[in-house]
């Protein structure tokens, strides 16, 4: 019987299935960070249980770490406690961890792939919503809760019910100035934040296959914002080439065997999906969110929508509330919106490809950050990304233009550290969520690509980067 990629990943990890469909799945890799792991480790200690498979776990602090000078440690006592607790727990249980001042430290969903700890055919979990990122490698990856983190630590298994299959097929040549971020925002704009509820989404088509692994990770990262349990892309030569020679990747003869095994992780030609959504890449335009949900998105050459034109009363009320919170008027041209702050970073867009794209725009425009921009910051996704960017001189491109070049971490993606918006401040952000208060109480978030964020920093308002040439 023909199988989808999701079917294959699921079926190769089933330990046992109950009559009601509840399935015990084997988990190949668990990634840990400081926010959702303390209670899990405490549960193990209270029950006097060991970690079942120590080598299957990899930990890093990312949510609470400062992105400025780290020589004085962490100022906030709560943040410091969480980071110190992860350090102590990993030391006690023997789990590999990249501590705050380790060059390999970074955002958990960036360090996993760059270390080769994320591999095709794996089941991967983490106590974090955006674990779907790792599905870009032909893996089944999704976020879990703290009690489930403990369960995986203790048993290397997880109770799950199988999702339905969805294929999002994007075909054609992506226009100049458009990126993976624009693709996924366009997808969410089309199907909505509940469009993927109950599904695991496979992203396919010629446009997706043409993306780099960085681009594929951006798309899969935001599958959760479409309501999906997981997002994934089939294995191909791009996948294999990215993983070759990475520290956790198989080596020698084992590498050859692994590559042969990975080749199966793609949907069979005649596999059936429960839902298929198609997009024409040629019609995708640089995207900007205007509201308080990723589905509230439009093109850079568009206008803020008018709630009065929405027939659905529930949607109309949501639009009115969003516009009030965002302090925007209906029919306002998107290009006239002026951010106060610029954030280039997060597990969505803080890889070397993203940093290069933003730097290219800054060099192309050849000017400094606009006077109305209070802060423009670039936060690399890991110490290794930061080091690579510095070898290429990209840090100088930013700092000479008036940007701040920071240390790696989750930073302004969420208000859980020192990097945050003040009430009423507006931010052009390359992150994944624009909910009320996400970047700070009363903060207003517009989700965009790194290139779009960089252009807004220089021009002082959103601009259509397709015009840069």
UniProtKB/Swiss-Prot annotation:
The UniProt keywords, alphabetically, are:
4Fe-4S, Amino-acid biosynthesis, Branched-chain amino acid biosynthesis, Iron, Iron-sulfur, Leucine biosynthesis, Lyase, Metal-binding
> Which EC class does it fall in?
lyase
Q: Give the note describing cofactor binding and stoichiometry.
A: Binds 1 [4Fe-4S] cluster per subunit.
Q: Where does [4Fe-4S] cluster bind?
A: 347, 410, 413
Question: GO molecular-function annotation terms?
Answer: 3-isopropylmalate dehydratase activity; 4 iron, 4 sulfur cluster binding; metal ion binding
Q: Which reaction does it catalyse?
A: (2R,3S)-3-isopropylmalate = (2S)-2-isopropylmalate
What is one GO biological process annotated to this record? Answer: L-leucine biosynthetic process
Q: What is its EC number?
A: 4.2.1.33
Q: In which pathway does it act?
A: Amino-acid biosynthesis; L-leucine biosynthesis; L-leucine from 3-methyl-2-oxobutanoate: step 2/4
List required co-factors: [4Fe-4S] cluster
Q: Which family does it belong to?
A: Belongs to the aconitase/IPM isomerase family. LeuC type 1 subfamily.
Subunit structure of this chain's protein: Heterodimer of LeuC and LeuD.
The molecule here is called: 3-isopropylmalate dehydratase large subunit
Protein's organism:
Paraburkholderia phymatum (strain DSM 17167 / CIP 108236 / LMG 21445 / STM815) (Burkholderia phymatum)
This chain is encoded by the gene named: leuC
């Amino acid at each position: 019987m023909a199988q989808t990629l999701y079917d294959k990943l699921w079926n190769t990890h089933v330990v046992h299935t109950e009559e009601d469909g509840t399935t015990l799945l084997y988990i190949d890799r668990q990634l840990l960070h400081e926010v959702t792991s303390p209670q899990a480790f405490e549960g193990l200690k209270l029950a006097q249980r060991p970690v079942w498979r120590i080598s299957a776990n990899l930990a890093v602090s990312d949510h609470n770490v400062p992105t400025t000078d780290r020589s004085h440690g962490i100022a906030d006592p709560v943040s410091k406690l969480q980071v110190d607790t992860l350090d102590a727990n990993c030391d006690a249980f023997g789990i590999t961890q990249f501590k705050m001042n380790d060059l390999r430290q970074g955002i958990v969903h960036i360090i996993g792939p760059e270390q080769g700890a994320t591999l095709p055919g794996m089941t991967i979990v983490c106590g974090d919503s955006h674990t779907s990122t790792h599905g870009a490698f032909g893996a089944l990856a999704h976020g879990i809760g703290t009690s489930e983190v403990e369960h995986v630590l203790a048993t290397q298994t997880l109770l799950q019910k199988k999702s339905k299959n969805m294929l999002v097929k994007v075909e054609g040549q992506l226009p100049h100035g458009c990126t993976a971020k624009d693709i996924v925002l366009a997808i969410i704009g089309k199907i909505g934040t509940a469009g993927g509820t109950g599904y695991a989404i496979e992203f396919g088509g010629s446009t997706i296959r043409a993306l780099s692994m960085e681009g594929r990770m951006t798309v899969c990262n935001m599958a959760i914002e479409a309501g999906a349990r997981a997002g994934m892309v089939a294995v191909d030569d791009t996948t294999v080439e990215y993983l070759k020679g990475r520290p956790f990747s198989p080596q020698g003869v084992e590498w050859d065997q692994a590559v042969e095994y990975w080749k199966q992780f793609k949907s069979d030609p005649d596999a059936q999906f429960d839902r298929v959504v198609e997009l024409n890449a040629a019609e995708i335009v640089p995207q900007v969110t205007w509201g308080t949900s990723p589905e509230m998105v439009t093109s850079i050459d568009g206008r803020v929508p008018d709630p009065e034109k929405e027939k659905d009363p529930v949607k109309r009320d949501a639009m009115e509330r969003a516009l009030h919170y965002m302090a925007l008027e209906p029919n306002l041209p998107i290009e006239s919106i002026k951010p106060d702050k610029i954030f280039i970073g997060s597990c969505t867009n803080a890889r070397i490809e993203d940093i290069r794209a933003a730097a290219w725009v800054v060099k192309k425009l050849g000017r400094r950050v606009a006077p109305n921009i209070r802060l423009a910051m670039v936060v690399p996704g890991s110490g290794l990304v930061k080091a690579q960017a510095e070898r290429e001189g990209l840090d100088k491109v930013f700092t000479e233009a008036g940007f701040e070049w920071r240390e790696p971490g989750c930073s302004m993606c969420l208000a859980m550290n020192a990097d945050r918006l003040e009430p009423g401040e507006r931010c052009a952000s390359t992150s994944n969520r624009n909910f009320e208060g996400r970047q700070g109480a009363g903060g207003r978030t517009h989700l965009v690509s790194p290139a779009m964020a960089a252009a807004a920093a220089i021009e002082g308002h959103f601009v259509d980067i397709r015009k840069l040439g």
